[in-house]
UniProtKB/Swiss-Prot annotation:
The keyword Nucleotidyltransferase applies. Keywords: DNA replication, DNA-directed DNA polymerase, Nucleotidyltransferase, Transferase. Its EC number is 2.7.7.7. One of its GO terms (cellular component) is DNA polymerase III complex. The keyword Nucleotide-binding does not apply. DNA polymerase III is a complex, multichain enzyme responsible for most of the replicative synthesis in bacteria. This DNA polymerase also exhibits 3' to 5' exonuclease activity. The delta subunit seems to interact with the gamma subunit to transfer the beta subunit on the DNA. This is DNA polymerase III subunit delta. The gene is holA. Pfam families: DNA_pol3_delt_C, DNA_pol3_delta. Disulfide bonds: none annotated. GO terms for biological process: DNA-templated DNA replication. InterPro entries: DNA_pol3_clamp-load_cplx_C, DNA_pol3_delt_C, DNA_pol3_delta_N, DNA_polIII_delta, P-loop_NTPase. The lineage of its organism: Bacteria, Pseudomonadati, Pseudomonadota, Gammaproteobacteria, Enterobacterales. Belongs to the DNA polymerase HolA subunit family. It catalyses: DNA(n) + a 2'-deoxyribonucleoside 5'-triphosphate = DNA(n+1) + diphosphate.
Length: 332
């Protein structure tokens, strides 16, 4: 069984159609991209009709088996798409595949979706029980290195002419948000079709289109990107953005970082999980906690508390100046 990781989706050569595909993960746009690639390849191989089945009860497996039995070389080619419910175990999925595998043939294509938020899902799947003529595609969150790989092949796939510095600027700006990065690349390929895209093009595009969110400001701070964090603060100030929202977001991350620094067992991921921190921000927060001294974090929390006290006293005229000071403290 072939395994394709989502960051290599665009680099993989989908020339031969597999008998079945297993798409594992929870990142919707990656799942959709994988599905589109499979369906386009299936169409070239004479498949057109697709039946969608969402498993609610094991009894549905019998309906699929009956459908599979009815497909032979004299019937039209058919695609069966099976989406397993979120609560189903990997073991149950594998049992269903075992029942279905003897009915796989050239007129039947299976696309199986397994929803999972576990980035180590492959460790729980025994790929040996699957028939060898299938392909598994993982659609889970990327780390920073995987984002660079995915971006490189995405750019190649859409035939975009872009400098390396401009590519790095895009990755840095999107702060790990692959969905927004994907949308931006698609737009850029249309706006600057057949033209070289440089850092100036990207900077102008970002300035024209940007509507920043609190997490983008915090991610810029934790990446020590002072210039970008100041730019975001400028926009928030001009928009009269509610500063309490910024305080709450930053308080959460600073307290999480403090807990990580205090943890003697180095069980960082349990702390992040208990603090409901998004998985694609784990490495960012851990790396910042490792780099920075206690004094920087305590000083930042103290200043953040003073800013909140000023807001509660309705002294909002000079509120934004301490935010700029806070940005400098956190970044330096």
């Amino acid at each position: 069984m072939k395994i394709i990781h989502s960051e290599n989706l665009f680099s993989y050569s989908f020339k031969t159609l597999s008998s079945y595909y297993v798409i594992v993960g929870n990142v919707k746009h990656l799942i959709q991209q994988s599905t589109n690639i499979i369906l386009n390849l299936a169409k070239k191989n004479g498949f057109s009709k697709m039946s969608k089945i969402i498993f609610c009860d094991p009894i549905y497996i019998n309906n699929i088996i009956l459908s599979a039995k009815s497909q032979n070389l004299f019937f039209k080619k058919k695609i069966i798409s099976i989406s397993f419910k979120k609560y189903i175990s990997i073991k149950e999925v594998q049992n269903y595949i075992l029942k279905l595998k003897k009915y796989l043939h050239t007129n039947l294509l299976l696309i199986i979706y397994i929803y999972s938020t576990n980035t180590n899902i492959l460790n729980k799947i025994n790929t040996k029980i699957f028939p060898p003529n299938g392909t598994m595609i993982t659609c889970t969150f990327f780390n920073q290195n995987n984002i660079s790989i995915w971006t490189k092949y995405k750019i190649k796939n859409i035939k975009m002419n872009i400098t390396k510095n401009a590519e790095n600027l895009l990755i840095q700006y999107h702060q790990g948000n692959v969905l927004h990065l994907n949308n931006t690349l698609n737009i850029l390929s249309l706006v600057w079709k057949n033209k070289l895209i440089n850092t100036l093009s990207i900077t102008n595009f970002i300035e024209d289109c940007s509507i920043f969110k609190p997490l983008q400001w915090i991610n810029a701070l934790l990446n020590n990107n002072l210039q970008f964090s100041i730019k975001i603060l400028n926009q928030f100030e001009n928009q009269n953005f509610n500063p309490i929202i910024l305080i709450r977001y930053l308080q959460h991350d600073l307290l999480t970082i403090l807990l990580i620094k205090r943890d003697d067992v180095k069980n960082y991921y349990n702390i992040l999980k208990n603090r409901n921190t998004n998985k694609n921000r784990h490495s960012l927060i851990i790396n910042y906690a490792r780099r920075k001294h206690y004094k920087t974090i305590y000083k930042s929390i103290k200043l953040l508390t003073l800013i909140e006290l000023q807001i509660k006293k309705n002294n909002t005229k000079l509120i934004w100046l301490p935010f700029y000071t806070l940005s400098i403290i956190i970044c330096l």
